[in-house]
From Swiss-Prot:
Bidirectionally degrades single-stranded DNA into large acid-insoluble oligonucleotides, which are then degraded further into small acid-soluble oligonucleotides. It catalyses: Exonucleolytic cleavage in either 5'- to 3'- or 3'- to 5'-direction to yield nucleoside 5'-phosphates. GO terms for molecular function: exodeoxyribonuclease VII activity; nucleic acid binding. The gene is xseA. It comes from the Bacteria. PANTHER family: EXODEOXYRIBONUCLEASE 7 LARGE SUBUNIT. Belongs to the XseA family. This is Exodeoxyribonuclease 7 large subunit. It comes from Vibrio campbellii (strain ATCC BAA-1116).
Length: 443
């Protein structure tokens, strides 16, 4: 018989709660690219979806407070880039992602890769100030790794010629843009280290877009710079351009010309030393601020997990799940009832008295036709009788008498004059004929 302590025996709910906390605390924030499927937007305003690729899929939830910031309408089939934290939906034990931001895959992809690599290398200590090498106070030879046709090389050579013409320069020509550029620059750093012919290396180019400078965000190049035994100055773009190479190099110069000033001496070499220290201090401050920002983000993430809104989100997700289950149950009930009604209707049709009704209707139609025929005959007879009566009536009609040459004389008041004594001199008489009337005055 097995014997276990109470501490080793889990309930299902406790196990799911422990796994959820483990996922949320250990994994933190992740960036993920995938295709949307099973997208759902209930009345609660939250979004539920599945992110998948050709071999796997994961369920996701994006709560209303976060999806309001999404600038496009997601749909099944969209390729998206999401920022999310891992979690577990405890009621079902489903592993899921809680999405905090979403954008189409192409938008911001380079910036997200930049931030991810930056965090990775910082966590490994590649940006630590303790790993930085000091620049030689009096370099004997300077190596320049850049394009042999670019403006950066000519800017560096002009500054060195003006400030310290006797300082030897070794140029390691490479591409500084495109897919092969990072590998070429890493190989050039390796050659410079194996030859051991320079005291300091300048790696850089002129300004450009994020895509133009992307080769300086390459992980292989970054690790090669960090492993170099020769101090390296990163001089990429303009002062506002920042790359991974800037963080991992021993010192960052805002421009190629500034890098040349760092390795050359002139009458203001004391001021130059101050500039060097300022750059070191700025680099240290940037690293310190980056570390503090990362710690603040971690603390903020922990605080968000303990915020009541997080618990509300989980409860709302459970409510949405219950709502969807209720809808499915109602649909099944309605479907079952419809099928029962259809079966009863079919049985009723099999026993329908339609045929008998059709026969009775046929008989009724025949009776109706006979009745109509009888009515027609009766009407014909009555019309004939009416015509005969009309002829008889016409023979005694006053109008018929008028047509035979007779007339009727009346006073203006309409009284019929039948005798001469009925009128006097001056009376107006109206004599009605068959085709009109005459008016006359008695003299």
């Amino acid at each position: 018989m097995l014997s276990q302590t109470n501490q080793n025996i889990f309930t299902v709910s406790r196990l799911n709660a422990e796994v959820r906390l483990l996922l949320e605390n250990e994994m933190g924030i992740v960036w993920l690219v995938g295709e949307i499927s099973n997208f759902s937007a209930p009345v609660s305003g939250h979004w539920y979806l599945t992110l998948k690729d050709s071999r796997a899929q994961v369920k996701c939830a994006m709560f209303r407070g976060n999806n309001r910031r999404v600038t496009f309408k997601p749909a099944n089939g969209n390729q998206v880039l999401v920022k999310a934290r891992l979690s577990l939906y405890e009621p079902r034990g489903d592993y899921q992602l809680i999405i905090e931001s979403m954008q189409p895959e192409g938008d911001g992809r380079l910036q997200q890769e930049f931030e991810a690599l930056k965090m990775k290398l910082a966590a490994e200590g590649l940006f630590a100030q303790t790993n930085k090498q000091p620049l030689p106070e009096h370099p004997k030879r300077v190596g320049v790794i850049t394009s042999k046709t670019g403006a950066a090389l000519y800017d560096i050579l002009d500054v060195l010629k003006r400030r310290d013409p006797s300082l030897p320069v070794v140029v390691y020509p490479t591409m500084v843009q495109g897919e092969e550029a990072a590998i070429q620059m890493a190989q050039a750093i390796g050659r410079a280290n194996s030859r051991d012919e320079c005291d300091v290396l300048i790696v850089g180019r002129g300004g450009g877009s994020l895509e133009d400078l992307w080769c300086f965000n390459n992980e292989i190049l970054a690790r090669t710079i960090a492993a170099s035994q020769i101090p390296i100055i990163s001089a990429v773009g303009h002062e506002v351009d920042v790359t991974i190479a800037d963080f991992v190099a021993d010192i960052r110069a805002p421009t190629p010309s500034a890098a040349a000033e760092l390795v050359s001496r002139d009458n203001s070499h004391k001021d130059q030393a101050l500039v060097t220290h300022q750059h070191k201090l700025a680099s240290a401050m940037r690293y310190y601020l980056a570390q503090q920002k990362q710690q603040s983000a971690q603390l903020m993430h922990r605080l968000e997990r303990q915020h009541p809104s997080y618990q509300l989100q989980r409860q709302t997700q459970q409510l949405d799940e219950l709502e969807m289950r209720l809808q499915r149950a109602m649909q099944r009930f309605i479907t079952t009832r419809q099928q029962a009604v259809e079966r009863k209707h079919h049985r009723l049709q099999l026993n329908s008295p339609v045929k008998r009704l059709a026969e009775q209707k046929s008989k009724l139609d025949r009776v109706e036709q006979k009745l109509l025929d009888a009515m027609d005959r009766k009407l014909l007879t009555m019309r004939h009788q009416l015509a005969i009566a009309a002829e008889k009536l016409d023979t005694v009609s006053p109008l018929a008498t008028l047509k035979r040459g007779y007339s009727i004389t009346q006073t203006e008041q309409g009284q019929v004059v039948t005798q001469a004594k009925d009128v006097k001199t001056g009376d107006v008489l109206v004599t009605r004929l068959s085709d009109g009337e005459l008016r006359s005055t008695v003299n």
